[in-house]
């Protein structure tokens, strides 16, 4: 069983890391090729491409210029510890044990606009490049064209090694669009988190993102390899809702 999640725009390169282990991203050569193109952009081009302020455009221009191989612990840190969005608040990897990191390294992957697919302990330098960014490149009009079948092929590698041919999709739609389900050698289950509001269950973005991280941590800390056991997830008041679920979409609801 393999879990996939999205990266985050917010980063943490200051907190002390709780593990000395690190690995190298599998698609680093592709990332380097992509970065060669990004380095040609002026600060205002970065702002326009990403739809961000001039200040953030300059920050990410500088990140592109500073990005260089080899990635080491001096200029990069482990992906699971570098990202700091709502999903990662829920994951709380800074409190992982050595066993948690080992299990995550086998069973968790992070989809990335720059790196394609990341293992939790793969070193990443500071960057921002969302998968939906329409950055024209030698392979096509955007990042989906750039990555083509490579993301799916990279996910198939651990899927072949794991006992259960199931992929738990805890990534956003923007990132999961980089995966080609027809070529994925796994059944896809997408957990959905809904909260009670104004008389009905709704997806509330902040809560849903955090819940994706919480479920990832639940699977990792309990070393779950049987997808059916995910239905027992009850952290933060969520419960599996069989009436709202189907084979490919498992709905978890919460009344606050």
Swiss-Prot record:
GO terms for biological process: response to hydroperoxide. One of its GO terms (cellular component) is cytosol. PANTHER family: PEROXIDE STRESS RESISTANCE PROTEIN YAAA, PEROXIDE STRESS RESPONSE PROTEIN YAAA. This is UPF0246 protein TERTU_4575. Coiled coil: none annotated. Pfam families: H2O2_YaaD. It comes from Teredinibacter turnerae (strain ATCC 39867 / T7901). Belongs to the UPF0246 family. It comes from the Bacteria.
């Amino acid at each position: 069983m393999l879990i996939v999640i999205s990266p985050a725009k917010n980063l943490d390169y200051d907190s002390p890391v709780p593990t000395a282990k690190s690995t190298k991203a599998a698609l680093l050569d592709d990332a380097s090729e992509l970065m060669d193109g990004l380095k040609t952009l002026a600060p205002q081009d970065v702002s326009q491409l990403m739809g961000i302020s001039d200040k953030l455009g300059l920050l990410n221009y500088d990140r592109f210029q500073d990005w260089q191989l080899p990635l080491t612990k001096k200029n990069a840190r482990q992906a699971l510890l570098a990202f700091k969005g709502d999903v990662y608040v829920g994951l709380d990897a800074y409190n992982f044990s050595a066993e948690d990191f080992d299990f995550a390294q086998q069973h968790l992957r992070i989809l990335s606009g720059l790196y394609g697919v990341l293992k939790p302990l793969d070193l990443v330098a500071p960057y921002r490049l969302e998968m939906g960014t329409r950055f024209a490149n030698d392979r096509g009009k955007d990042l989906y064209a750039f990555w083509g079948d490579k993301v799916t092929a990279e996910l198939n590698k651990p899927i072949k090694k794991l006992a259960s041919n199931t992929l738990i999709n805890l990534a956003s739609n923007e990132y999961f669009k980089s995966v080609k389900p027809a070529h994925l050698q796994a059944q896809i289950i997408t957990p959905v988190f809904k909260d009670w509001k104004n008389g009905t269950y709704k997806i509330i973005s902040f809560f849903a993102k955090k819940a994706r991280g919480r479920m990832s941590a639940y699977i990792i800390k309990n070393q779950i390899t049987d997808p059916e056991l995910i239905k027992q997830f009850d952290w933060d008041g969520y419960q599996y809702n069989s009436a709202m679920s189907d084979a490919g979409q498992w709905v978890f609801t919460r009344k606050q």
